[in-house]
Structures are given as structure tokens and as C-alpha cells.
């Protein structure tokens, strides 16, 4: 389960950023994880709750945006939804597909609470 190491990396990154900004806690973390990123959001949520214990993110709400996969045919240029890496173009039948979205994995934003808030 690589989601645990991913959760730990997220906690480390947001904790460091929040501390640099003088935060006393992180209240919200927004992630963007494409459906083709190879990360299971529910497993990540489970791991995050354990990884965040004792950190500034310990009580943070985790919001995950999951953009769909999109592919573009290298032969005809048609763009379409894909659920997996090996897709056939629905327009011309080509297997020469380039994934154009759905592989994203990033920390979109964090909301911090500073002393006195």
C-alpha cells in the first residue's frame, strides 16, 4: 500500500509550509488526484488519518478532487474520456493515444489557522 508513504509525504509538506507561515493548525487540505494517478482516494484518506496524528494536520479536513482521465488520439486528434491507459480511439480505432489529463497528483491548497484565530 503506497498510499501510506504518499500520506506521510503530504503531511510532511503541508506541515512544513504551515509552520513556515506561523500556523498553529491546518484546518483543510485540498488535493487533486486524477483517476489515472494510481492512487486510491479511500486508501489515502485512511492512511492520512494515521499519518497526520500529532501534526498540525491532525484535525484537518481532507478534500480530494478526482478529475477524469482524458486521452487524445495521435492519428485523428479526437479527445475523449479514458478509464485506463490502453484505450482505443472511439473515432478512428487507433491505439496511439496520449493521456492529456487524469494523472494529476498535487496539493491544491491548504487552509491554516494562526495563533489567536
UniProtKB/Swiss-Prot annotation:
GO biological process: protein maturation; protein modification process
Binding annotation for Ni(2+): 2
Keyword Metal-binding: yes
Keyword Ribosomal protein: no
Transmembrane segments: none
InterPro entries: Hydgase_Ni_incorp_HypA/HybF_CS, HypA/HybF
Molecular function (Gene Ontology), one example: nickel cation binding
Residues annotated as binding Zn(2+): 73, 76, 89, 92
Top-level taxon: Bacteria
Any one Pfam family match given in the protein's UniProt record, by short name: HypA
PANTHER family: HYDROGENASE MATURATION FACTOR HYPA
Primary role: Involved in the maturation of [NiFe] hydrogenases. Required for nickel insertion into the metal center of the hydrogenase.
Family affiliation: Belongs to the HypA/HybF family.
NCBIfam families per UniProt: hypA
Protein's UniProt name: Hydrogenase maturation factor HypA
Source organism of this protein record: Chlorobium luteolum (strain DSM 273 / BCRC 81028 / 2530)
Amino acid at each position: 500500500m503506497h498510499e501510506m508513504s504518499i500520506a506521510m509525504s503530504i503531511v510532511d509538506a503541508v506541515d512544513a509550509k504551515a509552520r513556515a507561515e506561523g500556523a498553529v493548525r491546518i484546518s483543510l487540505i485540498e488535493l487533486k488526484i486524477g483517476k489515472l494517478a494510481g492512487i486510491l482516494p479511500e486508501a489515502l484518506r485512511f492512511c492520512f488519518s494515521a499519518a497526520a496524528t500529532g501534526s498540525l494536520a491532525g484535525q484537518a479536513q481532507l478534500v480530494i478532487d478526482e478529475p477524469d482521465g482524458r486521452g487524445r488520439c495521435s492519428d485523428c486528434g479526437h479527445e475523449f474520456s479514458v478509464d485506463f491507459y490502453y484505450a482505443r480511439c472511439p473515432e478512428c480505432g487507433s491505439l496511439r493515444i496520449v493521456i492529456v489529463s487524469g494523472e494529476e497528483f498535487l496539493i491544491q491548497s491548504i487552509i491554516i489557522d494562526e495563533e489567536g484565530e
